[in-house]
Amino acid sequence: MSAPLANDTFLRALRRQPTEYTPLWLMRQAGRYLPEYNATRARAGSFLGLAKSPAYATEVTLQPLDRYPLDAAILFSDILTVPDAMGLGLSFEQGEGPRFARPVRSEADVAALSVPDMASLQYVFDAVSEIRRALVQDGRQRVPLIGFSGSPWTLACYMVEGGGSDDFRTVKSMLYARPDLMHRILEINAAAVIDYLNAQIDAGAQAVMVFDTWGGALADGIYQTFSLAYMARVVEGLRAGADGQRVPVILFTKGGGLWLESMAQTGADALGVDWTVNLQLARVRTGGRVALQGNLDPTVLFAEPDAIRAQVRRVLEDYAAGGDSDGHVFNLGHGISQFTPPESVAVLVDEVHTFSRALRTRLP
């Protein structure tokens, strides 16, 4: 039997239930802005050495929680674990980011693709279980654990391009010239992501997030067909947790503010939004069907403390202008920069918790 949660504010917010304050966590909260993370990564020898070790992954997952009173932990891993398990030869070059030795470019490459055996990703599921155990203090679990995956489209971008890209010329060329091949890749990716997230849920993930990092690179109409439809398939394929309760699902398309109405119809419990979106309008546009997560510009954290506090208050007030503060998870609009001063994060966390409590006393 799992330990009860000491702090379930994050899960209640995802379910749009009343909360005493606005919970927060940060995308890339375990990362290079923390000196303790860099020390652990040095011991691991490489990024993959870090990500593929359940012990190291557990250590770095807990580091931001030991420094700040965050309301959720997120599994330390990488979105490219799934295509790596497909045998595409993932490596991380210093200063260049991820690279695949065998990108998916030809009809033969696509024909050779298959959903990977989840046993090859056991290190991820072992990390989930180990993190859940490590979160327990005095018989209670400190905060919930989030699992995650890249979206089918975002994974396809890396698989076809062979790494990151400024213009996605190769993958978009395939999409327009051979949509049949692209749909085949996306079908395999969606099936793999469903298996992957369900295995994380079985291992103990209490919420899951789908990162559609490159969905915003698509044209209107194309996004709905080649990204959103496959994320909806993923949401539909996820199962309940060990307690029989639905595990909340968060969808995040960076640059996807144009499509919030459609995203809210996927069955997801929450939508991540970036800093280009007004949260009050986002609530209206989504009709109260989903919780919202976001949406501070990460570069605000390079400002002075007073400016950080002012921008935090602006985000919280924008959401509360919709009538209440329920159903809001505070986050950045994208991942935290590696150059962020750790003390700025302390200011952010304090202001979110303090001001959101005060704001609730002023709301009807």
Curated annotation (Swiss-Prot):
Species of origin: Ralstonia nicotianae (strain ATCC BAA-1114 / GMI1000)
EC primary class: lyase
Domain of life of the native organism: Bacteria
UniProt xrefs under PANTHER family: METHYLTETRAHYDROFOLATE:HOMOCYSTEINE METHYLTRANSFERASE RELATED, UROPORPHYRINOGEN DECARBOXYLASE
HAMAP family for this protein: URO_D
Keywords carried by this UniProt record: Cytoplasm, Decarboxylase, Lyase, Porphyrin biosynthesis
Calcium keyword on record: no
Higher taxonomy: Bacteria, Pseudomonadati, Pseudomonadota, Betaproteobacteria, Burkholderiales
Cystine pairings recorded for this chain: none
SUPFAM superfamilies: UROD/MetE-like
Protein name, as recorded: Uroporphyrinogen decarboxylase
